[in-house]
């Protein structure tokens, strides 16, 4: 498993006592036991355990939004506590993804890449998907963390002709440029919007918001031309979530 930025919110929360719960919501591992209804995986299988538990049968899952599965258990459909020796995974028939072979068949780098498919890469791809990024589109990615980096990769996979990353960190800029970004904008606010529009020769066809702040959402809306599309995957951390 790995540490997501959202795990740190819980870790740093003074209202949560130490030892009360495990962090983590994305993992790869070996199936130890299965329930009677499970037919798609068996003990010994190497699998990706994603951060959502879609049933694969409801309207939300059929529409490709398993994160809001109509049949989810508990208050949310996110995994919790996977930084543990064993975890219980609901809706395994549809949600667990079998990986060919065993962990020993892969290098450490390949295992880390597979782990990214449990959350961060699908989240970045989901931003591009819901924004309907298509070949030739001009795309802006707001957020240069792991999800933003994966959104850059996803936009390139979808055939975007220009990909502008809004970032202030040199190492993250270099990573994104190596992954397919065509330009970087460090400015924010109206200055940043003007810079993006200058680079693209107008507004963007799609904006992929990967931060979750009001400022980031305003930035995403500001860089779009009329009729542009926004993929919003940043976890909201502000009061107004309408």
Regions found by a protein language model. Give the residues of each.
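Short glycine-centered segments of the SAM/dcSAM-binding site in methyltransferase folds
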Residues: 46, 138, 228-229
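NAD(P)H dinucleotide-binding glycine-rich loop of Rossmann-like/cofactor-binding domains
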Residues: 55-142
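Glycine-rich phosphate-binding loop and adjacent beta-alpha segment
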Residues: 160, 211-242
């Amino acid at each position: 498993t790995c540490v997501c930025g959202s795990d740190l919110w819980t870790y740093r929360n003074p209202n949560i006592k130490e030892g009360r719960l495990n962090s983590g919501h994305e993992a790869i591992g070996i199936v130890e036991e299965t329930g009677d209804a499970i037919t798609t995986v068996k003990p010994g299988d190497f699998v990706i355990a994603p951060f959502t538990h879609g049933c694969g049968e409801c309207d939300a899952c059929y529409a490709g939004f398993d994160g809001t599965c109509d049949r989810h258990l508990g208050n949310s459909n996110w995994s919790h506590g996977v930084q543990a020796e064993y975890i219980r995974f609901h809706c395994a028939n549809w949600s667990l993804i079998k990986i060919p072979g065993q962990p020993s068949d892969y290098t450490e780098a390949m295992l880390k890449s597979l782990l990214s498919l449990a959350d961060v890469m699908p989240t970045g791809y989901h931003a591009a998907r819901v924004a309907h990024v298509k070949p030739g589109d001009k795309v802006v990615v707001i957020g240069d963390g792991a999800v933003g980096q994966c959104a850059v990769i996803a936009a390139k996979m979808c055939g975007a002709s220009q990909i502008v990353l809004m970032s202030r960190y040199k190492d993250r800029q270099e990573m994104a440029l190596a992954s397919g970004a065509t330009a970087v904008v460090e400015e924010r606010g109206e200055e940043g919007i003007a810079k993006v529009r200058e680079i693209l020769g107008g507004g963007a066809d799609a904006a992929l918001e990967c931060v979750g702040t009001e400022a980031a959402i305003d930035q995403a809306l500001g860089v779009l031309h009329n009729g542009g599309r926004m993929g919003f995957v940043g976890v909201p951390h502000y009061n107004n979530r309408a």
